[in-house]
Amino acid sequence: PDLLLTGRTLMGHEASKNQQLEDHYFGAIPTRVAAFMKDLEIQALELGIPVKTRHNEVAPNQFELAPIFEECNLAVDHNMLIMSLMRKVARSHGFRLLLHEKPFKGVNGSGKHNNWSLGTDTGVLLMAPGKTAEDNLRFITFIVNTLMAVYHHNGLLKASIMSATNAHRLGANEAPPAIISSFLGKQLTQVLDHIEESGNDDLVSLAGKQGMKLDIPQIPELLIDNTDRNRTSPFAFTGNRFEFRAVGSEANCASAMIALNAAVAEQLARFKQDVDALIEKGEPKISAIIEIIRRYIKECKPVRFDGNGYSDEWKAEAAHRGLDCETSCPLIFDNYLKPASIAMFESTGVMTRKELEARNEVKWETYTKKIQIEARVLGDLAMNHIIPVATEYQSKLINNVYKMKELFPAEKASQLSAENMKLIEEIARRTIFITEHVNAMVEARKVANKIESEREKAIAYHDTIAPMLEEIRYH
């Protein structure tokens, strides 16, 4: 019932064999699953949704599908259609689709990798290095401006992917941490360091009839291989795009894409203003661009991180760098209503303050209701299913102890029933704990439900009720 009503198990013991051997990840796709995938792909293509990748993932019965890239609006719509189609096709093959980010405790959960890039209306890919220094300057310009957007709106990007369900997955050793940083790879990092450390005169020189000569290092074609190594980064550059890996598996990708697109749009407008200001002071255009890029490279350096995103050292370092390290879902949503976020959305014409406030009310309310439903389901399971079975087993043990005393001398009976006595005590201790905590959880919900502010109510559910779910599960 918990899996059916909430999308995840609220109780249950971890299986003896799950993903330890990695035999599912490296194994062949089962025949029935392959038939489901084939049927799904055909129906997706009939709807005009191009898909290509199919392979096993780490957790048992976990698989991956990858659509081919499209324009952002269309790709988001197609992603929602695929989710709906998956459910329908799965049922026709005798399967059930689980889109929850963490349906089973102890095995890997699910997520989406949003591959994001920029191109012109004439087909020029702005996130790909070129063959000339000028092409590479353009490439570096857009890379650095994207990093600036991620740096200045670090908390907002995290808020755009955060939810009650995705919170189970982020920060575990299967998903990016709940700190938004960007991995660039060794070669691209060296290029940015070269620009940062070189003066304008070193990078721009006169070259006879050619005009300006740029000393931008050649970026090799092997860039993709060198930038796809760090799987712990939530926002990694992978050759000709950034891969936003923190989006939840049941999420609408629009939330993350709206925040990212608006942030980059605002940053590009700021870049144009900064360059124009230098040109007005008499600086040549190329020199002005490089000067601003150098300034940006230094400014956004805190968001660049190529190390292990799972480590405790990174959490401490991220806090030192001033990155958003908040882990409370309701508090993370506050980033939408920060002055910088409101100014960004309004200046780009994406949303007004009122629209942002309304959306946040929905986010807080949804969070509260998700935890509320889980608490109700867990309370019902514990009181009406788990405890009755536990006490029934306890009664059998007690009966066994009494019969031991009837059959054997007191000392012998005590010796033989010692383990049963320990079990009887442990069951009593655990059932008392569960009963007390379920009752406490009910009372905590009553108190929280009286709070009028959706934000404060969500915080109460996060701080008080959500931890009880794990405590009850453990016992």
What name fits each language-model region?
Residues I293-H475:
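C-terminal amphipathic alpha-helical interaction region
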